[in-house]
Amino acid sequence: GGRAMGRMLNWWGDTVVLMGVFPMIASDIHGHLRPVDQAYFRKTREARLGKTLEEAAASRDTAVEGFRNALTPMRLTLKTQPYLGGASPNYADYIMFGTFQWARATSPFRLLKEDDPVYAWREKLLDAFGGMARKSPGYAV
């Protein structure tokens, strides 16, 4: 049962969370790359997105609303318990948090509103383990 549930979380995290975030921050990631890597990144990511990095960035203020709505299962869970995994964080939390930490490391774009339970959850995980994630280089989002 646990592995099957883990696979579902992986797929949901990859298809909803990660692929929801990526178009909104792709242009910011490009800016962090070495010049020698930027052409390859642009070519392959624009092919994946079906638009230029600039077009993806231009629509992110609208796209973020759809992304936030897609987080409803997380939000509903976090309204009834402190972590996705229950009373304490577990794999479910870490697999989802990884995408938010990656976004924080590469983009100043605000994915979450401060009054969102998902924002509060992310804040707790940023402070977990002595604040290890928060101390890592990143933007204040």
Each model region followed by its residue ranges:
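GST superfamily/GST-like fold recognition
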Residues: L84-A105
